[in-house]
């Protein structure tokens, strides 16, 4: 009988990665970030444990989408009150809270349970080029989300 490998939690080494979202495609970038957060590219990956790394996303205000999504993609939220549904386009949300766009895309690609919530806390998104995590010495994560472009 094959058993799932259980890595010791204290032996796991968590890396810090930094991603520049300037002109990157939203969905492709989010799927790469979700893979790193889950730890799927590590040898010690275990489906029910948090084996992933930390990811810092900078320049979230400069993320790109293709086609007419800038004006047609809608983000919805509800206040919990009757008639409390609020709808906002991608362009308006990008002006108001650009971090939420990346967070929303990545959160949708993580498990919908307590493990997903734990993984989501390891994502740090910032609208501008600065971040307060210099002490962690993050490595640059090369992500090519533009089809046909050289990385």
From Swiss-Prot:
InterPro entries: Ribosomal_uL13 (IPR005822), Ribosomal_uL13_bac-type (IPR005823), Ribosomal_uL13_CS (IPR023563), Ribosomal_uL13_sf (IPR036899). One of its GO terms (biological process) is negative regulation of translation. Keywords: Ribonucleoprotein, Ribosomal protein. SUPFAM superfamilies: Ribosomal protein L13 (SSF52161). One of its GO terms (cellular component) is cytosolic large ribosomal subunit. This protein is one of the early assembly proteins of the 50S ribosomal subunit, although it is not seen to bind rRNA by itself. It is important during the early stages of 50S assembly. Belongs to the universal ribosomal protein uL13 family. Part of the 50S ribosomal subunit. This is Large ribosomal subunit protein uL13. It comes from Microchaete diplosiphon.
């Amino acid at each position: 009988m094959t058993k799932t490998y259980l890595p010791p939690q204290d032996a796991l080494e968590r890396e810090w990665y930094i991603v520049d979202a300037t002109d990157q495609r939203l969905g492709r970038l989010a799927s790469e970030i979700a893979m790193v957060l889950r730890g799927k590219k590590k040898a010690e990956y275990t489906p029910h444990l948090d084996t992933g790394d930390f990811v810092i996303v900078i320049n979230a205000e400069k993320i790109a989408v293709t086609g007419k999504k800038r004006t047609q993609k809608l983000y919805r939220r509800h206040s919990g009150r009757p008639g409390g549904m609020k709808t906002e386009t991608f362009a308006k949300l990008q002006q108001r809270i650009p971090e939420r766009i990346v967070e929303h895309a990545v959160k949708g690609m993580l498990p919908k349970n307590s493990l997903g919530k734990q993984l989501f806390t390891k994502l740090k998104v910032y609208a501008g080029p600065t971040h307060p995590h210099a002490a962690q010495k993050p490595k640059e994560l090369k992500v090519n989300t533009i089809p046909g472009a050289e990385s």
